[in-house]
């Protein structure tokens, strides 16, 4: 009944992944992002992660893998997903949803920390504001985007972009793969210090 559609979905997902892998620069950017985060941790910094919708869930997943564990037992790493419901509702009500992440960065971000922002379009105003706040605080910025990078293109220290122009879910599928690779590389890099 749906077998052809199921196969077509999997083939499209595979094609998006293959296109991403075929650009050697993407592989280098993943390594660069992992080293940037690891170096922040080694110097006493932390990661603040943020996103909207499914990307919000990915931001939370990234932070919990850092504070908890990915594959191996090891010390927790300092990471916070900007996801506190009371903060989000307060700032949304009092200032506007476009400031929910930037207000948090202003409050707890420090020089040497890393902002990890996810936006499949690259146009999320609240992520753009968070990037601006992070730069003001002397933080480094890693952006995970899609399509042509949108307004976030060129703003981050490291931008990992999935150049897919149809649906956001295909971009998110690559984002979660990248997140898992980042976790693995961060664990490798931090183990050198132990």
UniProtKB/Swiss-Prot annotation:
Question: What is the top-level taxon of the source organism?
Answer: Bacteria
Q: Which organism is it from?
A: Haemophilus influenzae (strain 86-028NP)
Q: Which residue ranges does the record assign to the SIS domain?
A: 37-194
The Swiss-Prot or TrEMBL record annotates one GO molecular function as: carbohydrate derivative binding
Query: One of this protein's GO BP terms?
Result: carbohydrate metabolic process
Q: Which InterPro entries match?
A: GmhA/DiaA, Phosphoheptose_Isoase, SIS_dom, SIS_dom_sf, SIS_GmhA/DiaA_subfam
* Presence of the UniProt keyword Transmembrane helix in the record: no
Give the classification, highest ranks. Answer: Bacteria, Pseudomonadati, Pseudomonadota, Gammaproteobacteria, Pasteurellales
Supply the EC number(s): 5.3.1.28
> Which Pfam families does the annotation name?
SIS_2
Binding of Zn(2+), residues: 61, 65, 172, 180
Q: How does it assemble?
A: Homotetramer.
Q: Where does substrate bind?
A: 52-54, 65, 93-94, 119-121, 124, 172
The answer to whether keyword Transcription regulation applies is: no
Family label: Belongs to the SIS family. GmhA subfamily.
The further comment given in this record reads:
The reaction produces a racemic mixture of D-glycero-alpha-D-manno-heptose 7-phosphate and D-glycero-beta-D-manno-heptose 7-phosphate.
Q: Which PROSITE patterns match?
A: SIS
Q: What is the name attached to this protein's record?
A: Phosphoheptose isomerase
Q: How is the cofactor bound?
A: Binds 1 zinc ion per subunit.
Cofactor(s) needed by this chain? Zn(2+)
Tell me, what does this protein do in biology? Catalyzes the isomerization of sedoheptulose 7-phosphate in D-glycero-D-manno-heptose 7-phosphate.
Pathway in which this enzyme or protein is active? Carbohydrate biosynthesis; D-glycero-D-manno-heptose 7-phosphate biosynthesis; D-glycero-alpha-D-manno-heptose 7-phosphate and D-glycero-beta-D-manno-heptose 7-phosphate from sedoheptulose 7-phosphate: step 1/1
Q: Which PANTHER family match?
A: PHOSPHOHEPTOSE ISOMERASE, SEDOHEPTULOSE 7-PHOSPHATE ISOMERASE / DNAA INITIATOR-ASSOCIATING FACTOR FOR REPLICATION INITIATION
């Amino acid at each position: 009944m749906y077998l052809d559609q199921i196969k077509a979905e999997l083939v499209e997902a595979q094609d998006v992944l293959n296109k991403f892998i075929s650009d050697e620069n993407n592989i280098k950017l993943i390594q660069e992002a992992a080293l940037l985060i690891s170096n922040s941790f080694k110097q006493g910094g932390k990661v603040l992660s943020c996103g909207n919708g499914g990307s919000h869930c990915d931001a939370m997943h990234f932070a919990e893998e850092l504070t908890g564990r990915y594959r191996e037992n090891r010390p927790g790493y300092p990471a916070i997903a900007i996801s506190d419901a009371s903060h989000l509702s307060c700032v949304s009500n009092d200032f506007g949803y476009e400031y929910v992440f930037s207000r948090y960065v202003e409050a707890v971000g420090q020089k040497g920390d890393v902002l990890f922002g996810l936006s499949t379009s690259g146009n999320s105003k609240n992520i753009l504001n968070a990037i601006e706040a992070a730069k003001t605080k002397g933080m480094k910025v890693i952006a995970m985007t899609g399509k042509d990078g949108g307004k976030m293109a060129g703003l981050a220290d490291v931008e990992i972009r999935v150049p897919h122009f149809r649906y956001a879910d295909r971009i998110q599928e690559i984002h979660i793969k990248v997140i898992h690779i980042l976790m693995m590389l961060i664990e490798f890099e931090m183990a050198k210090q132990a």
